[in-house]
Regions:
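C-terminal functional modules of predominantly eukaryotic multidomain proteins
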Residues: 1-110, 114, 180, 216-221, ...
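Amphipathic alpha-helical interaction motifs in eukaryotic regulatory proteins
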Residues: 2-3, 37, 131, 187, ...
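Short, flexible beta-strand-to-coil junctions
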Residues: 150-155, 204-206, 236-242
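Short HxH-centered metal-ligating active-site micro-motif
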Residues: 165-218
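N-terminal, Lys/Arg-enriched amphipathic/low-complexity engagement segments
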Residues: 149-173
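Short beta-strand scaffold segments in enzyme catalytic cores
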Residues: 144-150, 232-235
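Eukaryote-biased feature marking scaffold/signaling PDZ-domain proteins and nuclear chromatin regulators
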Residues: 8-10, 26, 31, 37-39, ...
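Active-site-proximal, Lys/Arg-enriched surface segment
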Residues: 112-137
Length: 388
């Protein structure tokens, strides 16, 4: 383990009991046969050519002033033991305790009962169209929709008021979000309305005992790390020919650590999560684990959205200026703030650069105060439509 960590040839490493390198520790011995005390300091001497390490490392050979940094987590400061070892034995000294500390930083995979999200309320309007399209397609392919709403961090309750289905390519066993879809701009819009990205819903055919597959675990862990611990994944499956079943899950803290530490490896089995190295799984060293070991069930129920309109198509349906023109015609008798109070309508005009970010902010403030939208913005959109 020491040789791998230092990128050295293990056959050219000699360990010693003393700092003067006079009492070598025999090769191929154990802690017991070597008669070493707990936390005993041992000394290492490399008898090979340092040019080998240059080639292996691919960089110039440099003197590491503080090797303890290699054994610390991101942003972590040296422990008292590390400081003491450096003070007593020099800045390059390391002990077994250093390696034990590094090992403890690795994810420990086990069942986790509680999650940050206590309950998830999703509005019927937010996923209604998503459910209808999934039923029409017979759930033959995986699809995803992002959910935006508000989080009560005191109670752990989340309410999703609207959904935005991204441009995506759907397959029988997974989906791929198009790189052209700018989720960050959609998050900016949501923030102007006092909301944030709170989760996603994935539709697929039900599989007994396995609500989420391996790639869903990895994706959920990625989003929970990026958008916060409350991010929740809804799984939408057919209940019968005319209705759907909705379940909610968060992935465990261990899954988030796996994603953050880049421990995930590609898996050929959708029911098994593979690791790049052996990790502790239920107190045993393993290189894989059952997908269900990473799931935390969340209470879910339906509610009503605070957003009045959900008529405009999502980006995933690839709306055009013709859809914009028809939408404005259909709502021309409504107050302008009400017409604009459709999340996917705002997504369309913002992502397609029909309005600037400053104009978007002004629109959202007028919507929240129920004031008429500035005529200059309304006229700009109407002029675009009249050119068709």
């Amino acid at each position: 383990m020491i040789a791998n960590d230092l990128k050295l040839d293990s056959s050219k490493i000699q360990l010693y009991y003393d700092q003067k390198y006079l009492r070598p520790i025999p090769y191929r011995c154990t802690l017991l046969t070597a008669r070493m005390r707990d936390r005993q300091i041992i000394f290492m001497k490399y008898v090979g050519d340092l040019e080998d390490r240059k080639k292996n490392a691919g960089t110039k050979m440099t003197t590491e002033i503080d090797p303890s940094k290699r054994f610390l987590g991101e942003g972590e400061k040296p422990t008292n033991e590390m400081k003491m070892v450096g003070k007593n034995y020099g800045p390059r000294a390391v002990t077994v305790g250093f390696f034990e500390h590094k090992e403890k930083l690795k994810p420990n995979i086990d069942f986790q009962e509680e999650s940050s999200c206590y309950a998830f309320r999703v509005s019927k309007e937010a996923i209604k169209r998503f459910q209808i399209l999934s039923l029409q397609n017979g759930f033959e392919k995986h699809r995803v929709i992002f959910l935006f709403g508000r989080i009560n961090k005191i109670t752990g309750k989340i309410t999703a008021h609207c959904g935005c289905e991204p441009i995506q390519t759907s397959y029988a066993d997974h989906f791929e979000i198009d790189e052209s879809f700018d989720i960050e701009k959609v998050c900016t819009l949501a923030s102007f309305l006092g909301m944030e990205l709170v989760g996603m819903a994935i539709s697929h055919k039900p599989e007994e005992k396995f609500p989420m597959s391996e790639y869903m675990i990895r994706l959920a862990a990625k989003y929970q790390n990026k958008y916060g611990e409350y991010f929740t994944t809804l799984i939408v499956t057919p209940a019968n020919d005319n209705d759907v079943s909705v379940e909610a899950f968060q992935v465990s803290d261990a899954a988030m650590k796996l994603e953050k530490g880049n421990y995930f490896a590609e898996s050929k089995d959708p029911h098994v999560v593979e690791f790049k190295e052996e990790l502790t799984v239920c107190q045993f060293k393993r290189k894989s684990a059952d997908v269900n070991l990473f799931l935390c069930a969340v209470r879910v129920r339906q509610t009503n959205s605070k957003i009045p309109l959900h008529d405009f198509p999502s980006p995933g349906q690839e709306p055009s200026l013709l859809d914009l023109k028809q939408y404005l015609i259909d709502h021309e008798s409504c107050p302008s703030w009400y017409t604009f109070f459709d999340f996917n309508f705002l997504v369309f005009i913002f992502l397609n650069d029909l309005i600037s970010e400053d104009e978007l902010y002004t629109i959202t403030q007028e919507i929240k105060s129920k004031q008429e939208i500035a005529p200059s913005i309304y006229n700009k959109l109407n002029n675009l439509c009249n050119q068709l």
